[in-house]
């Protein structure tokens, strides 16, 4: 027979792995006589142990042993049996006891074991899978493929140890001995990490969650930005998703809106009129797929004394006074029959479409035609939303009530509504169409919710970047001037802010990467809340103490009224308030009254917290809480100090010098306002309270040029046990970098916001207002200290002041105590020099 013929008869079974070869004979380790020497064997008989495993033909040395619990997938699969497990060189054996003389009840060759992995069937348990068909097992890597393909030949046994260390010890020992496992186990508890990158050829991001991809697709974040700081891009996306309602409807970014004021309310500050803004609707989603709540709404400029007469009727809440005017005589005819949910946005004469930036002015003579166009656009947006939910731009047909903040001055465009806890049921539509009813839940997509600046942005920059602040006295700045949108001299309606909007409760939240949810904080029961409210409220009928002058605004959970005090109660709570008050109340005082419906407040405990904070924070630079009345268990009246001058935002927007080449305010005026604000902040910080939402909207003035801080809905108190916070609240453009990066922070975030507010008064808007929402957050996180438009026109003192306020490193950022000693405040003007800024209200 030839060699080739013999080779054809060789089968795979002729080359089976029959185990290790027997050990060769070796000399005695103690130097004694070996067996191959010429000696009488009888002298060595005593040294022979016929039962020794070292002299057997096959290796049976024991490597590891111990007691375990065992069960298989056979007839007794429901019983865990106690067995003694032994690991030998060539097999694993299970015995009834630890005596090696007994036969094993189960012996598994190591060459038949194809898988060993931990299982949750029992604590400290692992599964051993073996192949029962010996013919299907072959050596090498190919054998595992053959065995795994034949599921019928597999059998499993489960072995449980007593401790975690025993479990890992057995796994390591079995892996090391089994030839088919190669010492590498199957993965356990693994997580699939998504690799995100940027493809320069296609210009798109790859390997990214779907909702992130849609956000970045139309944003201004470029591949260069990704390459420069990809971690910052991820932080921005996580920030946007986590705090824009992804998986949690409470974490929504409140959306500022604009509307029209009543000519009968010229004496009201726009902070009051801000509550009216909740009555008007705007498109809530930009065409980029990014939430339009950061789309700019500040007008570039506006001539003073240009108001469009609109009067608000009574709201859905019970009015305070039945004599409250509800006339429509001041409403333009073409607006009287406009349904509430089709009420257009008219700010600065612009009517943005699809949530984009305004493209051009709208002439007042064409307002009716523009209104019809907006209605058609909103109908188209609803149809588009049915096909493309991510690009929804119109309002939802059924608004849901959003809790109304306690402070009547509150402009309602903060990041997170502190009273929001869960989505509310939709409100029924009101029969009175001419009354502006707030529409809080107009965004049907969480990603379309509430991430929007408060002002109309100028045209995108076309010149070089702004120059940074000089770090020393000799620093010079030579930069190109960034153009700002031209001033609109046409007659436009007076503008204000509208209430935030919330995503609908029944809309599916977007997918993507999300952080683990933190456990919910325990909340007080209704009985506890009512008990605390009664302790801080006056037990009297407020309708007998105040005469309502006019209605300033309407919210989903309450109304705001301008009233005059007619009587001072004599209850003990009121006497205590009078004794602790800075200005004793008098009959005839003008006050602001916020009437709140408690049943429409999801988190009533925050109302109690805010009242307590305001009650303990009485200062000449803080809008003071006067008193509160719990009329019924569902009707709360909060009385606040009246600031007839309006907000700093209104003063900036209506300044006669607010144009491309001049600052809205002079440096002495800025120094005075910032100094007064800083004094109020120092008072709060000395009490370990962080305001967390300092901006021009929350700084109010009166006719005597007194400057006061308002809006304590987002304040937090620091303690020894919790000296820092990490909650993402506030308004994005005024946020410090550490807040955007989701790091812990302290009182110095208010100092950063104070510096941004100073830039507002210098340039008419905060930095990055004209940027895409995600790009703005990216720039805040990466650029740090923003750059000025015209640093060459500023004094050295104000640039030094900004440099210590806007220091990225918190360790070197000034405190409010240090700021009050800064030389910039030496140039502050007298209060009478601010009266010219209030002439636009006359």
From Swiss-Prot:
Residues 247-274, 297-307, 323-343, 470-481, 488-497 have a biased composition (Polar residues). The keyword Signal does not apply. Residues 12-34, 247-524 are annotated as: Disordered. The active site is at 693 (proton acceptor). Residues 184-197 form the CRIB domain. Involved in budding and cytokinesis. This is Serine/threonine-protein kinase CLA4. The lineage of its organism: Eukaryota, Fungi, Dikarya, Ascomycota, Saccharomycotina. The gene is CLA4.
